[in-house]
C-alpha cells in the first residue's frame, strides 16, 4: 500500500496501523492490514499536528460510464455537462465529488483547490483510455469547495492552472476558481408556463422584447449591482407596466471583464456570480414566467477570450480554438474562435445551449455574431484567411454546427426560440435544416434597422430624396422570420441615443422618436427595444451606471413611455398586427409612392385564425413636420374607421392634432380600394385605424 501526501507528517489506517514514510520522500507505504477492503479510510496528521480522517480517493474505481465517453468522442453527447465538471454524488456507497475534464494533450492532470492547498501533487487524476477525459472521485468533499485543474502538457512540459470549462458556478471576478455546486433542487412554480411553451406557435403570437443589461438597468444606492431576486421584482413590474412580452438579457454567462457586457464568456454553464447564486437566477426566470413574461438569453458560441486561466490553450495546445490563427483568432475583437469541426467542442457548445433551456427554463437564445461564424474571411484582409475545401469563404464546419444546434434544441425543447444576430444576406437563415437552411427560429433584421435609422436621421426636408430607404425593406421582409431590433449596439460607442439621433429641436426629436416606434410596431416582424429607449433616454447607454430614470420627471419622457405601453397593448390586442408577421399575405401597401409628402401607408391583415379573420389595421405615417389636411386614404372596407392610436396625442407629448377618434369611409375608390377615408395627418406622427361598428 502506497500513499503520497506532501503535507502529512504521518499516515495511518483508521484502525491505527501506521504507514511508514519512505526515507527522503513524501511517500508512505507498507503492507495492507489483514481483512482491509475498499473503500478504506486513512488518518493523516499534518505537520502542525492536526489530524484528518477520510476515504482514500484512489481506493475507488472509475466513476464515468464508458457510454458517456463514447458519445462524447463521437460528438453526440448533447448533455456533456452531466458527466464533465464537478458533480457531488455517491460512488460505491460513499458521498463525494466526481471531477472530470477533457484534456487529451496532457500527460498529467490534477484537481487543485482550497481542500489541498492548491497543490497539484495531492490529487492527480486518471485518464480514461483514448478519450482524453481525466477523472477522479474525491470522497467527503463538501459543496462550495473551490477548485481548478492543474495540467502538464505532454510535449512542452508546461504546467497550466485552468478553471473548469463545465463549472456551474464560479468565484466573483477577479477570482476565477470554479465552485462545487450541488445538484439543483429549486422548486419551480412555472408549470403552466412551461406546458404552454411547448404548444405555442411563436410565428403567430405577439413577441415584443425588452433588451436588458442587468448590470446597468438599475443599481443600488451606493452604485453596486442589484441581485437577481431584486431585479426580478423590479423588472417584472416595469415590463408588465410597459407591456413587453419577453425580456432579453445581455449575456449573464460568467465572464471576467465587466466592459465586455458579457460577450466574452468564460463560463458557459454558469450564471454570473455578480448578481447572485444559480438558484437566484432560477428565481429570476421563475418570477418572470409566473407573471407571463418570457426570458431570452444572449449566448456567444462565436468566440471566447484569451484569459490564460480559461479555455485558451487549455491543455497546452489549441484545444477549443482552431490551431491555425487564420481560422482561430478574431482580429477585431482580440478573441479566439471555436474549432467547430471538433466533436468535443461541438458537444461543449450544444450542451451549453440545452443546459440553459432545460436547467434554467430559458425560453430562447439569441446567438451573437453569427456572421463572423459563417464567413472564413469575416473582417479579414486578403491573405489572412484559409478557403474551405471547395475554395470558398463559407465556414462549412460552423454551418454544420449551427444546423445541428438548431435541430437538437428545437427537437429536445419544443417551443423555444433560437434567434440569429446575422448582419449579411446569407440565405435561408430561418428556413428548416431539411430544406438546406440554418434552422434558426428568427433573425434580426439589421438591414431594416440600418435603413430606418439612416432615414430618420435625415432632416425632414431632405427625406423625400431618401424615400426608398423606407420602402426597400419590403422587398425582402418575408424572406426570413425577422425581428425588428433597436438594440444596445445602436445607442453606444458614439452613435448617441435614439432620441438624439433624431433631427430637429426638442419637440421634433420627441415627435420623430414617437413616429419611429409607431413604424416599428406596425411593420411586419417581432419587436425588440433596448432598455432606456422606452422612455427616450437622452444620454448614450453607459454600462457602468444605471439608466437615467430621473428623466421620467419630465412630461415628454413620460409621454414616450406611455406611447410604448400603448403600442405594446395595440400590438397584442390587434391580431392583424402580429398573426402574420412572417407572411406576405398579412401586409399590403396602400401607398408607398408619396415621396413629395414623405408619407407611407399600409395595411396589416389577419388572414384568419381557426377559420375566422379579424379586421385589418391601417397605418399612415407622416415623416414631415407639416400637417396634412384632407389626406385621402384608400381602405378595403366601408363603415367607421376608429383611430386606434395617434402618436401626436397630448397623452404622448404631441399637439393633439387628429381625427376626433375616427372617420367614416366614403364610397370613393382610391389607391386601388373601393372605399376611402379623409384624414388629418399630424406632423411627424403615425396614425393607426381599424374598422368597427361605429362611434
Curated annotation (Swiss-Prot):
Cross-referenced Pfam families: Alpha-amylase (PF00128), Alpha-amylase_C (PF02806), CBM_48 (PF02922)
Pathway info: Glycan biosynthesis; glycogen biosynthesis
One MF term in the entry's GO annotations: hydrolase activity, hydrolyzing O-glycosyl compounds
EC number(s) from the headed UniProt entry: 2.4.1.18
Protein name, entry field: 1,4-alpha-glucan branching enzyme GlgB
Function statement: Catalyzes the formation of the alpha-1,6-glucosidic linkages in glycogen by scission of a 1,4-alpha-linked oligosaccharide from growing alpha-1,4-glucan chains and the subsequent attachment of the oligosaccharide to the alpha-1,6 position.
Organism field: Alkalilimnicola ehrlichii (strain ATCC BAA-1101 / DSM 17681 / MLHE-1)
Keyword terms, alphabetized: Carbohydrate metabolism, Glycogen biosynthesis, Glycogen metabolism, Glycosyltransferase, Transferase
GO CC terms: cytosol
Amino acid at each position: 500500500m502506497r500513499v503520497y501526501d506532501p503535507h502529512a507528517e504521518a499516515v495511518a489506517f483508521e484502525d491505527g496501523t501506521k504507514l511508514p514514510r519512505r526515507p527522503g520522500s513524501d511517500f508512505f507505504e507498507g503492507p495492507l492490514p489483514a481483512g482491509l477492503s475498499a473503500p478504506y479510510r486513512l488518518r493523516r496528521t499534518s505537520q502542525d499536528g492536526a489530524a484528518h480522517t477520510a476515504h482514500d480517493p484512489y481506493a475507488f474505481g472509475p466513476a464515468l460510464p464508458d457510454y458517456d465517453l463514447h458519445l462524447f468522442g463521437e460528438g453526440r453527447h448533447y448533455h456533456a455537462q452531466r458527466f464533465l465538471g464537478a458533480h457531488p454524488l455517491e460512488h460505491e456507497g460513499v458521498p463525494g465529488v466526481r471531477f472530470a475534464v477533457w484534456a487529451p494533450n496532457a500527460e498529467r492532470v490534477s484537481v487543485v483547490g482550497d481542500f489541498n492547498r492548491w497543490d497539484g501533487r495531492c490529487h492527480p487524476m486518471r485518464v480514461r483510455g483514448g478519450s482524453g477525459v481525466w477523472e477522479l472521485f474525491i470522497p467527503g468533499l463538501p459543496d462550495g469547495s473551490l477548485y481548478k485543474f492543474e495540467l502538464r502538457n505532454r510535449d512542452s512540459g508546461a504546467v497550466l492552472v485552468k478553471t473548469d470549462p463545465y463549472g456551474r458556478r464560479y468565484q466573483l471576478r477577479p477570482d476565477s476558481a470554479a465552485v462545487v455546486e450541488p445538484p439543483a433542487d429549486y422548486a419551480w412554480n412555472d408549470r403552466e408556463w412551461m406546458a404552454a411553451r411547448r404548444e405555442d406557435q411563436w410565428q403567430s403570437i405577439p413577441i415584443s422584447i425588452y433588451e436588458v443589461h442587468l448590470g446597468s438597468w438599475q443599481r443600488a444606492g451606493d452604485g453596486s449591482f442589484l441581485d437577481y431576486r431584486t431585479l426580478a421584482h423590479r423588472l417584472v413590474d416595469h415590463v408588465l407596466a410597459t407591456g413587453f412580452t419577453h425580456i432579453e438579457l445581455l449575456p449573464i454567462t460568467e465572464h471576467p471583464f465587466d466592459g465586455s457586457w458579457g460577450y466574452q464568456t468564460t463560463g458557459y454553464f454558469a450564471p454570473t456570480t455578480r448578481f447572485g447564486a444559480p438558484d437566484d437566477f432560477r428565481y429570476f426566470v421563475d418570477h418572470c414566467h409566473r407573471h407571463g413574461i418570457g426570458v431570452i438569453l444572449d449566448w456567444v458560441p462565436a468566440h471566447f477570450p484569451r484569459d490564460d486561466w480559461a479555455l485558451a490553450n487549455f491543455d497546452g495546445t489549441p484545444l477549443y480554438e482552431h490551431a491555425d490563427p487564420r481560422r482561430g483568432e478574431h482580429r477585431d475583437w482580440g478573441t479566439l474562435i471555436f474549432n467547430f469541426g471538433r466533436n468535443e467542442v461541438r458537444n461543449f457548445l450544444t450542451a451549453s445551449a440545452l443546459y440553459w433551456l432545460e436547467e434554467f427554463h430559458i425560453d430562447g437564445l439569441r446567438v451573437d455574431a453569427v456572421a463572423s461564424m459563417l464567413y472564413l474571411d469575416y473582417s479579414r484582409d486578403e491573405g489572412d484567411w484559409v478557403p474551405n475545401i471547395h475554395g470558398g469563404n463559407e465556414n462549412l464546419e460552423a454551418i454544420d454546427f449551427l444546423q445541428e444546434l438548431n435541430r437538437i434544441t428545437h427537437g429536445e425543447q419544443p417551443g423555444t426560440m433560437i434567434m440569429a444576430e446575422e448582419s449579411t444576406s446569407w440565405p435561408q437563415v430561418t428556413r428548416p435544416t431539411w430544406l438546406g437552411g440554418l434552422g434558426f427560429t428568427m433573425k434580426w433584421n439589421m438591414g431594416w434597422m440600418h435603413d430606418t435609422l439612416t432615414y430618420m436621421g435625415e432632416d425632414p426636408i431632405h427625406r423625400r430624396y431618401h424615400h426608398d430607404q423606407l420602402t426597400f425593406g419590403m422587398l425582402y421582409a418575408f424572406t426570413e422570420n425577422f425581428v425588428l431590433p433597436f438594440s444596445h449596439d445602436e445607442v453606444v460607442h458614439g452613435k448617441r441615443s435614439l432620441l438624439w439621433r433624431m433631427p430637429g429641436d426638442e419637440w421634433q426629436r420627441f415627435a420623430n422618436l414617437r413616429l419611429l416606434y409607431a413604424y416599428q410596431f406596425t411593420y411586419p416582424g417581432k419587436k425588440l427595444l433596448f432598455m432606456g429607449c422606452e422612455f427616450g433616454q437622452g444620454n448614450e447607454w453607459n454600462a457602468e451606471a444605471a439608466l437615467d430614470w430621473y428623466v421620467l420627471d419630465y412630461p415628454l419622457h413620460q409621454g414616450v413611455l406611455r406611447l410604448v405601453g400603448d403600442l405594446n397593448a395595440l400590438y397584442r390586442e390587434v391580431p392583424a398586427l402580429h398573426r402574420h408577421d412572417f407572411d406576405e399575405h398579412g401586409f399590403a401597401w396602400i401607398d408607398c409612392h408619396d415621396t413629395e409628402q414623405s408619407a407611407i401607408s399600409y395595411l396589416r391583415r389577419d388572414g384568419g385564425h381557426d377559420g375566422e379573420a379579424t379586421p385589418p389595421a391601417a397605418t399612415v405615417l407622416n415623416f414631415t413636420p407639416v400637417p396634412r389636411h384632407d389626406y385621402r386614404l384608400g381602405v378595403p372596407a366601408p363603415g367607421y374607421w376608429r383611430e386606434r392610436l395617434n402618436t401626436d396625442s397630448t397623452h404622448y407629448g404631441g399637439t393633439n392634432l387628429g381625427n376626433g377618434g375616427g372617420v367614416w369611409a366614403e364610397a370613393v375608390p382610391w389607391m386601388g380600394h373601393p372605399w376611402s377615408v379623409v384624414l388629418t395627418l399630424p406632423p411627424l406622427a403615425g396614425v393607426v385605424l381599424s374598422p368597427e361598428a361605429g362611434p
